[in-house]
């Protein structure tokens, strides 16, 4: 990496610095949000630190069971995702939703990252990924 040069005009009018980092907290992946200890800690963070949003990956992940194959049919269940969102709303917080990893039943491959094995391959059929049946 090369050098960087920063300049500051001290005679310029002061400009407020928005503290965007004070509103949102990151929390790894969504299945953790189903745990009581995680919920207690987040509730405390909200109450004591004022966080209003929480960001995590995997709200639609395999571990939450949002999409499974049953007898050659894709079956959606948002029960766990709903439980997470309902909890956040109940304590005055909101999810910062990240749509990231591919569900295994739609994936074109098996390449994954991180310890929870988020699938990083594109869908086999983009129409099915969007929830539309293929012809």
How would you describe each model-predicted region?
Residues 1-135:
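Non-catalytic accessory regions flanking glycosidase/transglycosidase catalytic cores in CAZymes
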């Amino acid at each position: 990496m090369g050098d960087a040069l920063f300049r500051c005009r001290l005679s310029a009018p002061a400009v407020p610095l928005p503290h965007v980092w004070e509103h949102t907290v990151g929390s790894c992946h969504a299945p953790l949000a189903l745990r009581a200890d995680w919920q207690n800690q987040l509730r405390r963070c909200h109450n004591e630190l004022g966080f209003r949003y929480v960001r995590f990956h995997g709200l639609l992940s395999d571990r939450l069971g949002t999409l499974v194959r049953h007898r050659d049919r894709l079956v959606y269940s948002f029960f766990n995702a709903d439980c997470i969102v309902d909890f956040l709303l109940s304590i005055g917080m909101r999810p910062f939703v990240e749509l990231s990893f591919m569900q295994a039943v739609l994936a074109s491959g098996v390449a994954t990252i991180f310890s929870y094995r988020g699938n990083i391959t594109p869908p086999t059929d983009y129409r099915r990924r969007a929830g539309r049946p293929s012809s």
